[in-house]
Amino acid sequence: MRLYGAIGPRVDGDYFAQELASLDRGDFDMIHIRMNSPGGNVFQGMSIVSAILSMNTPVCVHIDGIAASMAAVVAVAADRVCMMDFAKMMIHDPYFTGESGKATSPKQKKALARLTDMLRQVLVRRGKDEATMAKLMREETWFSAAEALDAGLCDEITSSARNEFMNLDPMQLCLLYTSDAA
């Protein structure tokens, strides 16, 4: 499966959850989700999180570029998270869309506090303790793949075969081509 783009109208949480459920009825050892998303709607995203957490088949999310905001929460709900070596992950406290993004009424502040707690509960399942995660969310923290690995937010850093090929020194390249010709 692929989760590319913003979670919301483009990546509908209900539809995505239904697709996951149909794959869960299949004969798969693992379900792989490729991700490159700036995040999006918390309510749509939590539909995907709930679907991932209720799967019988293990789920692996591969972060191909960015997993920011709600997409990061979706990613860490998986059984396994792999990030490309150049990929980034970002977590932050939720906010209202609009002019200021800030909660103004006591009711809005209470709602945002509850949403923040809900998202943090998913993140702490595999990362830092609750107090540390709250601080990282409040500060809007960006992680490189190595930093996400250190924080427990991903399990593996991957690189493409092309990157590995480009990193070979000239002697290794010569040996590679001469051994194929023999």
Language-model features: where?
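N-terminal organellar transit peptides
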Residues: M1-M70, A77-A182
